Amino acid sequence: MRTIALGICIFISSIAFAQRDCATQSYIQEQKSTNPRLSNSIAEVETFIERQKLNARLTGGGMSSAANIIKVPVVVHVLYSSASQIIPDDRVKSQVEALNRDFRRDNWDSINTPERFKSLAADVQIEFVLATSDPKGRATNGIVRKKTSIEYWKSDDKIKFSSQGGDDAWDSQSYLNIWVGNLQSVIGYSSVPGGPAEKDGLVITTSVFGTINVGGVYNLGRTVVHEVGHWLGLKHIWGDYYCGDDLVDDTPVQGNFTPGCPTTFRSSCNNGSLGDMYMNYMDYTADACMNLFTEGQKARMRSLFFDGGPRASLLYSKGLNQPWTEEAPVVEIPVPVAVLYPNPATHEITLNLDDNWVGRLARIISINGNVVSTIKITSRLQIISIGQLKAGMYFLQAESESGKVREKFIKL
């Protein structure tokens, strides 16, 4: 929504948000207040992007041919304080697959793009691949799991440092770092090009990561798609202020974020017959209502990979090479014996267990320690009705030869 200036132009361990709460804008403002040089670095990146845009107009060129598929090595840092927060490999892979579908416009719901926007919808030609080699050249599957004593993370970057209970970034010149943990108040945030290398990457709350055993309205992996957009230099579709500028030429100017999942034409800021592009990945709609990046957004993201750009070094990363040093030591990863979702919940919860639990009893215990319900487990996927419970915090507890399960959940 390139505008002509005339003057001065929550996550509560929940997946049931009224609106998508991306903390990137507030995070960047906070970073600027503590790092005076960051504003200059971000401004330099913006100058670089504008220069590439001008060069493309003058030469009619750009990195857009099918031969120029950019592959980005990815490492996912999973931080967990309880067994239910351990994300298995298939769920991590489902998130990477979701990223690639949306960035390559292979998403099945691309047919839902309104006719007026179809000519603008883009195959960004960027793909994301879990790393095969770590920074020391050892074999990896691109997934790091680490137990932590931190129960809730904030958007203060502590999750990015081992010294503060998190996990240190892999070399951000060679990898996209994604940290996954139990975020408080927000569902995700990202650094932007030009920020400190040791903080570069995105942070996503556990319950919206991936597409397997993920409930609620953010269940298609598009929180990560949205945050990767920020990591590649995109702003929110409304420009982060009323009728603002997102620095992209082909997105209509828009008054504000769009909550929920609209089904009808919406218009703001005199954007005429085009109306609001609320189905853009950089808006706040539910995952099921998002389905496109534009050609302008594509050009902006890909420009960062030109020589001298802040993401250019990723083109030369060894993260997707065959390992070149000794094998990494095998690390025992505890397999979660139970996963409970959704959390919070209103009517029912699902308990995902292994076979050892079938026939056992599970108890729901109030915060005061009283047993309020007892359930016999009859299936590996046990659906438990909680509609009769009063709103509040509860614990689900069970025991078997596999050990003891005690999971906290919120009844809304």
Specify the residue positions occupied by each region the protein language model found.
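Active-site-proximal segment of zinc-dependent metalloprotease catalytic domains
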Residues: S155-G239
